[in-house]
Structure formats: structure tokens, C-alpha cells
């Protein structure tokens, strides 16, 4: 394998987005697909997605709430992935897969509006897990909707308010602590000066069209992998979810890094 393509998307309802997800996967052919906010039990996932050609699929969901998926392209890795749930999983929010020394996680962090303390505990447990994976000698790619805008510039100026959940200082502090456990924010590292690198938009007042949004969706990677990242793209024009897909490419041969942020049209 000369490159590894990993994609993440909060679909905000897998049944509503079936055709869009199928078309997107067929076009992009990621080696790893991470999905969040399925709002579906495993039995409710559309059959065409359960039988995704060329992929080993794992679904983890509940009726009308939360849920994650993780799908590994069959010819991307020599060995069968081992799917599992890290100990901090609750409300069907986390699934992981291990292939040799690589661990990939698809996670949907709680919003925190109903139980902010539970969100903070989830993040603390996530920090501990990242440390444990790296202590084991494995490499980690942690993907998903983390429900935190990491810094001020990850929120459009019209939306900035440090009192709002998702922008609170204590959340951002925990985010940085997670990164200090050996992860790199791939999108921001490849595009450090982009003030419009948003992945979520409120579904009203043409916010997406005007790109007045927040950056909530991330690909975080172990330092050794992040050093080989050649692309991290936000596909703002794709789909009708309130989130956009994010796609990262890691060059196994260590090619020079560049970034692509796709705009509508």
C-alpha cells in the first residue's frame, strides 16, 4: 500500500443519508470509513450499506440516537481487522478496529447539552485511552465528531461565544491534553492559516452556503503517521447532513505534504 485514505462523516441519520453515503464511498473508495450519529439500530441500517461491496463493516447503534460505524476496505490490509469497543464507550458512541500495530477509532463525543459532566468524563476517559494505546506501541488514528471547536479560529467570528458548550475553556483544555498524549490534529497541521476550516453548520439562514460554521470533526493521528499526512480535505459540498465529510491521506512512502480544502462548485 503506497497510501492510506481515512474518511470520517457525521451523517446525522444513516437511513436519511443512504444514497449519499453509498455514492460518496463509491467515489472516494477510502481504505477506512468512520461514520457517526447513525440514529439507527444495527437492524435498521439499510441493507445496501450492511453489504457494502469490498468492505468489512461494523455497525454499533441505537434507535433514533447516537451510533457509529467503522468499515475497512478488504484489500487495504493483509489481516482481518479486530473490531472492539474501548472501555469508555457508552450510548453506542465508540468503535475501534486494530490491524497489526494500527488502531483506528470512530467516535461521537456527547454534545454535553443534557449532561455536561458526562461529556467531560468521556473526554477524560478518551485521554487515558489514547495514552494506553501509545504505551502499547501501537499507532492510532482517532476520527469523528468530537463536539468541540478546538480554538477560537475553529468557529466563525459570528458564532464565537466561550460560554457556549463546544467552546468552553475547560473543553478546549481537555482537547489539548488529549493531543499531548501523542496525537496530532492533521487538518490544522496541514492548513494552519485557514480561518474558514469548518465542518458543521447550523441548519438555518444559509449558514452552510455562507460558511458560517464550526470545526467539530477531526482526524487525529499518532505523530509518526501525521508526519506522513499528505492531505486533509473538508468536503463542504457533499450531502445534506449538517456536517461535512473529512478525508485524510497518509503516504506510506513519506511524500511531501499538501492540503486540499474543497469548496462548493
Where are these regions (language model features)?
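Surface-exposed cleft-lining segments at the edges of enzyme active sites
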Residues: 84-85, 108-123, 159-164
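Active-site beta-strand/loop signature of hydrolases that rely on acidic residues for catalysis
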Residues: 6-10, 25-43, 104, 130-152, ...
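N-terminal, active-site-proximal structural segment of metallo-dependent hydrolase catalytic domains
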Residues: 1-52, 56, 63-68, 256-265
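Metal-dependent phosphoesterases centered on the DNase I-like endonuclease/exonuclease/phosphatase
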Residues: 53-54, 124-212, 216, 262-263
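Conserved beta strand-loop-helix elements of the APE1-like EEP
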Residues: 64-79, 204-227
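Structured beta-strand-rich core segments of catalytic domains in phosphoester-bond hydrolases
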Residues: 38-41, 45-110
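Surface polyanion/phosphate-binding segment centered on an Asp-His-Pro turn
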Residues: 233-265
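Active-site beta-strand termini and strand-to-loop segments that position acidic
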Residues: 73-74, 97-100, 222-223, 241, ...
Amino acid at each position: 500500500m503506497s497510501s492510506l485514505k481515512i474518511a470520517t462523516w457525521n451523517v446525522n441519520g444513516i437511513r436519511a443519508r443512504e444514497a449519499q453515503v453509498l455514492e460518496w464511498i463509491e467515489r472516494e473508495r477510502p481504505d477506512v470509513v468512520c461514520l457517526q450519529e447513525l440514529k439507527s439500530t444495527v437492524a435498521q441500517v439499510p441493507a445496501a450499506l450492511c453489504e457494502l461491496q469490498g468492505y468489512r463493516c461494523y455497525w454499533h447503534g441505537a434507535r433514533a440516537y447516537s451510533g457509529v460505524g467503522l468499515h475497512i476496505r478488504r484489500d487495504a490490509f493483509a489481516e482481518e481487522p479486530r473490531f472492539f469497543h474501548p472501555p469508555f464507550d457508552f450510548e453506542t458512541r465508540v468503535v475501534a478496529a486494530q490491524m497489526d500495530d494500527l488502531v483506528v477509532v470512530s467516535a461521537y463525543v456527547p454534545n454535553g447539552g443534557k449532561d455536561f459532566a458526562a461529556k467531560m468524563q468521556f473526554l477524560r476517559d478518551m485521554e487515558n485511552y489514547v495514552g494506553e494505546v501509545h504505551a502499547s506501541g501501537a499507532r492510532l488514528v482517532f476520527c469523528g465528531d468530537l463536539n468541540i471547536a478546538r480554538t477560537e479560529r475553529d468557529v466563525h467570528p459570528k458564532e464565537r461565544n466561550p460560554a457556549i458548550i463546544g467552546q468552553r475553556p475547560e473543553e478546549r483544555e481537555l482537547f489539548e491534553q488529549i493531543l499531548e498524549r501523542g496525537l496530532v490534529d492533521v487538518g490544522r497541521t496541514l492548513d494552519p492559516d485557514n480561518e474558514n476550516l469548518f465542518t458543521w453548520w447550523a441548519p438555518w439562514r444559509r449558514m452552510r452556503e455562507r460558511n458560517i460554521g464550526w470545526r467539530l470533526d477531526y482526524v487525529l493521528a499518532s505523530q509518526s503517521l501525521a508526519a506522513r499526512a499528505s492531505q486533509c480535505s473538508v468536503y463542504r459540498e457533499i450531502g445534506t447532513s449538517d456536517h461535512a465529510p473529512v478525508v485524510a491521506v497518509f503516504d506510506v512512502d513519506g511524500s511531501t505534504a499538501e492540503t486540499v480544502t474543497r469548496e462548493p462548485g
